[in-house]
Amino acid sequence: MCRFIVILGLAAFLALMGGCGGHKPDAGVNVKGKLTKGGQPVTVPNMAARVGTVKVELYPIHTDPNDGRSSFGTLANEDGTFEIVGEGQGVKPGKYKLSVIADPGDGQDQLGGKYGEANSTLEFEISANNVGGTQNLGDIKLD
């Protein structure tokens, strides 16, 4: 009888767990681009050692707070290029603000906060036509 209860309990547990973990996020878009300032890649000292970083983030501009979109970020390479790969499947289509923070490793933004989340005027539409692929934002010129 005890063995039957243990087996029944284990079967119930496995049945409940069968519904967990199988959901994959909806497909999205990988987003890439290149940051330049004065015609040169946006860089900071010590980037090769990843002490200095140029952090790039996409923040959703919500028209519907329940649209399920969230922010995504990455670090730019020394040549100014970046690629944001969203939560396993890419960034969800919609309007986003692009934030750029150039930190040489001392916590100070060499861009003076001009392109931080609160101040950036860089806005992009991530197209539903690119779901499952990549959208290139091209050369993003910072002044």
What do the predicted segments below correspond to?
Residues 2, 20-21:
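Short, low-complexity disordered leader/linker segments with a strong preference
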Residues 21-143:
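Beta-strand-dominated extracellular/periplasmic modules and repeats
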Residues 1-9:
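Bacterial N-terminal signal peptides that target proteins for export
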Residues 15-19:
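C-terminal motif of bacterial Sec signal peptides marking the signal peptidase cleavage site
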